[in-house]
């Protein structure tokens, strides 16, 4: 079965002041009116699984207006394991941790696999092979912690 999100907590993240969501072991559906924070919730989950936001914001844009810092954290459970992942945003930067130990964004993928599909992703079909390769590379980064280093080495080799 692997790990699954048990709970998600957002504090001063985007438009959300303080929210704790308990996820169902089967399926969780986010329902609400416009501007209720559904997309912000999906963005927070993606940050904790991929190590970055699909919106590509600056760290300051992640912090709720009027707040000094933001926190996104999740408890992942499954296979007899519990893993806590967290991202604190403050002073213009993001700090990730797993089970209370600081780590870097590239270390986050692989803890819990996720795939995000937005209406903008329809361009995968339209934009050609390079766009599809970029998307596959994103999946590779989540599946294997060393994949980012491998891609960087490949890019350097191709340049020379």
Regions found by a protein language model. Give the residues of each.
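Pre-Walker A-like glycine/lysine-rich segment at the N-terminus of P-loop NTPase domains
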Residues: 1-47
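Weak global preference for isoleucine
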Residues: 16, 21, 82-85, 108, ...
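Nucleotide-state sensing region of NTPase/ATPase domains
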Residues: 46-147
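Generic structural signal for well-ordered, non-membrane alpha-helices
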Residues: 134, 156-159
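Amphipathic alpha-helical coiled-coil segments
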Residues: 143-150, 154-157
């Amino acid at each position: 079965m692997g790990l699954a999100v048990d709970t998600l907590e957002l504090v001063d993240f985007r438009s959300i002041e303080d929210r704790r969501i308990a996820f169902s072991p089967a399926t969780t559906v986010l329902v609400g009116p416009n501007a209720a924070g559904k997309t912000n919730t999906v963005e927070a989950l993606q940050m904790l699984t991929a190590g970055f936001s699909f919106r590509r914001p600056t760290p300051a844009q992640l912090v709720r207006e009027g707040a000094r810092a933001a926190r996104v954290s999740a408890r992942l459970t499954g296979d007899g394991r519990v893993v806590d992942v967290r991202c604190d945003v403050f002073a213009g930067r993001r700090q990730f941790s797993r089970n209370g130990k600081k780590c870097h964004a590239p270390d986050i993928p692989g803890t819990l696999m996720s795939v995000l599909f937005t209406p903008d992703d329809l361009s995968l079909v339209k934009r050609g092979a390079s766009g599809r390769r970029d998307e596959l590379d994103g999946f590779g980064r989540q599946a294997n912690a060393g994949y980012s280093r491998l891609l960087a080495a490949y890019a350097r080799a191709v340049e020379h």
